[in-house]
Regions:
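Membrane-embedded transmembrane alpha-helical bundles that form the catalytic cores
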Residues: 1-191, 196-218
């Protein structure tokens, strides 16, 4: 995510310096509280293209319920094929499509359960649970995207439940693999937290009486 979002931000910034405004491509997708919200925040330009040229022509959501579910599955299967002609990509797309369909099917039961438990939709704890669940579901689907073949996928899925060897050295090696020390990782996490609290995405550089010209605008 950092690599993908990073170089698109560089492209947006370079274009802005030349007076060209490009659309935002990522909007903190990993704070999404549902898979549907995740796709409103992830790779926005590609998602918009699929919505305009595949989802809407098929009827979008303005059709019978089951046709809408069919449309969602078609869009995500095509999205998987767009990333590569491999069954792992197709499965990745199918999983995300299934996430969305199941989410729609369970919407009313979820609302009834929350009402029964007297849990408010605005509860901070509920927001945290939804973000955690969405993050886990997205990361699980990335396994299918990452696998080089169906056989590799089988190995990766088995390793989720077997041969756990979590140690200090393992955790340290994970951060070092990303080019970070443990302290550097903690500083990065703290910085991201502060940026989200400040909602830095809404900050603007504006020209005023001083004649300053905005260079980057998010």
């Amino acid at each position: 995510y950092c690599d993908f979002a990073g170089y698109t931000d560089i492209a947006i910034g370079c274009a802005r310096m030349m007076g060209i405004t490009l659309m935002q491509n990522f909007d903190r997708p990993y704070i999404a509280e549902s898979i549907q919200e995740f796709w409103r925040r992830w790779h926005i330009s590609l998602s918009s293209w699929f919505k305009d040229y595949i989802y809407f022509p098929l009827g979008g959501s303005r059709c019978a319920k089951w046709k809408n579910y069919r449309n969602i599955m078609i869009v995500f299967l095509v999205s998987g094929l767009w990333h590569g002609a491999a069954w792992t990509y197709v499965l990745w797309g199918a999983i995300h499509g299934a996430y969305q369909v199941i989410g729609k099917l369970l919407k009313v039961p979820r609302q009834k359960l929350l009402a029964l438990l007297h849990v408010s939709e605005d509860s901070r704890g509920l927001h945290m649970v939804r973000r955690f669940n969405t993050f886990v579901l997205v990361c699980f689907a990335w396994i299918f995207f990452r696998a080089n073949s169906i056989s590799d996928l089988g190995v990766l899925l088995r390793k989720l439940f077997t041969d756990w060897h979590i140690s200090d050295a393992y955790i340290k090696g994970t951060f070092e693999g990303m080019g970070l020390t443990l302290i550097g990782a903690l500083i990065t996490i703290l910085s991201i937290f502060i940026m989200n609290r400040m909602d830095i995405g809404k900050l603007r550089l504006s020209s005023g009486e001083s004649g300053c010209v905005p260079v980057f605008q998010y």
